[in-house]
Amino acid sequence: MENTENYLECERNRVYYTLIAIAGFFGAYTFLLRGKVFCNAQTGNLVLLGLAIGQAEWETAAYYLFPISAYMAGAFISELLPNPVKYHLKIRWDTLLIAVEMATVLVLGLVPESAPVQISQVAVNFIASMQYNTFRQAEGTPMATTFATNHIHVS
């Protein structure tokens, strides 16, 4: 058994389990309540995009480009921000990201049902991508907090 005292707080198992729950919430929220799009990961959206293209449903295919693009943007931004954040704000990127996720959940809770679903989809895709890209291991175990199949594999 490894000594867990040498890990950063963001690498603790309790953080990992919390992030898994958040990603599950994001996926259920956007699929069940916000347009039947998976926003915690993109495999489902890529499959649905491929099906739409295969059936020549161009409008539906274009619809799936929104979440996929937002996810890609989140990954890009999460690669660019850590060093400038640490340098200018004197705070770790992972700590700031947790605060941003909390604020995002709060704001999404205030978005009325009548609002376009793309608002929630883009926000969740963006934040889930940054979560996946930022939190990569828990106590020495590689992790992907937004993919359920990874949790089964790691268990």
What are these regions (language model features)?
Residues A23-F38:
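Alpha-helical transmembrane segments of multi-pass membrane proteins
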